[in-house]
Each structure stands twice: as structure tokens, then as C-alpha cells.
Amino acid sequence: MPSLKDLKNRIESVKSTRKITKAMQMVAAAKLRRAQEAAEQSRPYTERFNAVMAGLAASVGGSDSAPKLLSGTGSDKVQLLIVMTSERGLCGGFNTNIAKLARAHAQKLQGEGKDVKILTVGKKGRDQLKRDLGSLFIGHVDLTEIKRVSYVDAQGIAKDVLNRFDVGEFDVATIFYAKFVNVVSQIPTAQQIIPAKFEQQEGEEASTLFDYEPDEEAILADLLPRGVATQIFSALLENGASEQGARMSAMDNATRNAGEMIENLTIEFNRSRQAVITNELIEIISGAEAL
């Protein structure tokens, strides 16, 4: 049975931890508001850009002159997985869920006889995947010093990926991230970005509403690299909001659990102190009776 001093020390320790988790929850809440706004503001642009690109792609998809970023290499033998996670922990199952989805996809591809390569963005995913898939790593993007991701950061990642594609390092590229829904819901998502896939929105007829100059093929060749960067940027923003939402939820749970633990320890402390006082009274009474 722990002594009163031990129980008191544990109570103080848990109280100190609760202060930390509460502070982290408040910081995450503030960051979440900014990250959520950024993610939501980017969605209309991304959706409209994808709609226009879908119309262009539909008009030249079967053409022999279609850009390689759209038509592909003619093979899907070598697959590049771009796994986006956070640089910091204490965000519940956020990183684990993304890594789990990427790991399952990699194992599925390997089972089909495909060659898999992995590029990680964020050290938490790298640390989780390197245990069993480390031999597949071809690079890592460190975002530790970046407080708020920008389109320039996405362009840097896209440039590296496109350079690897141009020299024939892979045939298909897929990004893994968490799509933000709300504070308690972030959906691990896999999205192919090379060869480019643009879904035509219902009711959109971009290819018939506009005439393009000089022509669709030339415009696609110019816009497709930007499309890859846009999809990566959108994924980074969704990931940022998801990370802060997951951290806020995790710290809220930790704070409530700490409160419950303090209550239980306080009850145990009071019972132990009561037992000590009772024993002392019994000893005093017994001594008085002996006299």
C-alpha cells in the first residue's frame, strides 16, 4: 500500500500533467481555427481547378499527344507512395492511421508483384514505417522549421516528385494524408496524383463551355505540374487541420482522464490518512487503558 507521501506526490504530479495537457489543448484549438480556415478556403479553388482540368483531360485523354503526366508511362510496375504525417506527436491516432493505410497499400502492391518506393513528409510517419518498410524509402521531406505550410512548400515537394517521374524512377504516385471532417473525425485518404486523375463534377461541362488557345494539349502540359502541386498543397492543408483537430481531441481526453485520476488518488489519500488517524487513536486509547 503506498504511503501518504507517495500518494501526495502522485497527486501533484498528475495535477502538473493536467496543466500541460490543458495548455496544449488550448494551443491546438487556436491553431485548429487557422488550419481549418486555410483548408476550407482552398477547397473551392481546388475543386474548380480540378473541374477545368477534368474537362481538358477528357478532350485529349485518348490522344497520342496527351502529356505523360496525364497518360502515364504505360505501366504501373513501380509505385511511389508519398506519406504525409506530422512532425510532432501527442495527436492521438492521427499518424498511426495514415501510416496503417500506407502500409496496407504497400503490402497489397507487393503482393501483386509491384515495386514500391516511399517518400515521407513528416518524421512521425517515417519513424513508424521504417521499422518494416525502411528498405523502400527513397527520400524524406522535413517540415520541422515550417510554422505554416504554404504553396511554395507544396511546389518544392511537387518539383522533387516530378523530377523523379521525368527520369523514370516510378510510374504511379499516390499521396496519403488525413482529410479533415471535424475535431473528432479525420479520414485517412489515398489519392493518386500521377498519372493525374481529375474527376468531372456533376453539371460541369468545362470542355464544351470554353475554347482554349493555343490548344488543350499545350495548356495541359503547362497546367499539369501545377495541378500536382495544387493537390499536394490541398493535402498538406487538410493534414494540418486534421493534426490539430486530433491533438485537441487527444489533449481534451488526457485532461479529463487526469481529472478522474486526481479524484481517485484524492479518495485513496483521504482513506489512507483516515486509517492512519484511526490507528493512532486506537494506540492512544490502548495506552491509556493500560495505565
From Swiss-Prot:
The processes (GO biological process) annotated in the record are: proton motive force-driven plasma membrane ATP synthesis
Cell compartments where the protein resides: Cell inner membrane
Q: Which InterPro entries match?
A: ATP_synth_F1_ATPase_gsu, ATP_synth_F1_gsu, ATP_synth_F1_gsu_CS
Keyword entries, A-Z = ATP synthesis, Cell inner membrane, Cell membrane, CF(1), Hydrogen ion transport, Ion transport, Membrane, Transport
Membrane topology field:
Peripheral membrane protein
* GO CC field: plasma membrane; proton-transporting ATP synthase complex
Which cysteines share a disulfide bond? Answer: none
Molecular function (GO) terms for this protein are: ATP binding; proton-transporting ATP synthase activity, rotational mechanism
Assembly and binders = F-type ATPases have 2 components, CF(1) - the catalytic core - and CF(0) - the membrane proton channel. CF(1) has five subunits: alpha(3), beta(3), gamma(1), delta(1), epsilon(1). CF(0) has three main subunits: a, b and c.
Function comment: Produces ATP from ADP in the presence of a proton gradient across the membrane. The gamma chain is believed to be important in regulating ATPase activity and the flow of protons through the CF(0) complex.
What family does this belong to? Belongs to the ATPase gamma chain family.
Name of the protein in its database record: ATP synthase gamma chain
